[in-house]
Swiss-Prot record:
Keywords, ordered alphabetically: Antiviral defense, Cytokine, Glycoprotein, Growth regulation, Secreted, Signal
Protein name: Interferon gamma
A Pfam family assignment: IFN-gamma
Localization annotation: Secreted
Annotated signal peptide: 1-19
Native organism: Meleagris gallopavo (Wild turkey)
């Protein structure tokens, strides 16, 4: 349980990060609720600092907004899972859970994206059948890397006027 207590700091970061986009969030109340949650988990215990942060560090590798939304979706899901195992009769836990559910509904479903990445990592690239399929798909993959999406192309080209 002590490993989870350090994650409460990350929960604070998520709530603050989305505070500017989710105007309905009352950050002062959430901070108070998170402080109560920290007390529930005894997060001032000395072992919380051992080994450094376990979740905040992961956010450093995700720099673009859409990337961050994917990883934050996963993190919010983790916190919701963590709160499932707590006393939901406490008002502060109920409030934090409600706010996390609201945030989760505004985030993309990162589970599918993470599963796709894991499936790619599991591909046996030394398998001849996989190599054949991969070779067959290589050109279309390269096209996706080189060609900008059609929506960007349309916006980046100025409209041509008819010289009638």
């Amino acid at each position: 349980m002590t490993c989870q207590t350090y994650n409460l700091f990350v929960l604070s970061v998520i709530m603050i990060y989305y505070g500017h986009t989710a105007s309905s969030l009352n950050l002062v109340q959430l901070q108070d609720d998170i402080d109560k949650l920290k007390a529930d988990f005894n997060s001032s215990h000395s072992d919380v600092a051992d080994g450094g942060p376990i979740i905040v560090e992961k956010l450093k590798n995700w720099t673009e907004r859409n990337e961050k939304r994917i990883i934050l979706s996963q993190i919010v899901s983790m916190y919701l899972e963590m709160l499932e195992n707590t006393d939901k009769s406490k008002p502060h836990i109920k409030h934090i859970s409600e706010e996390l559910y609201t945030l989760k509904n505004n985030l993309p479903d990162g589970v599918k994206k993470v599963k796709d990445i894991m499936d790619l990592a599991k591909l046996q690239m030394n398998d001849l059948r996989i190599q054949r399929k991969a070779a067959n798909e290589l050109f279309s993959i390269l096209q996706k890397l080189v060609d900008p999406p059609s929506s960007k192309r349309k916006r980046s080209h100025p409209q041509r006027r008819c010289n009638c």
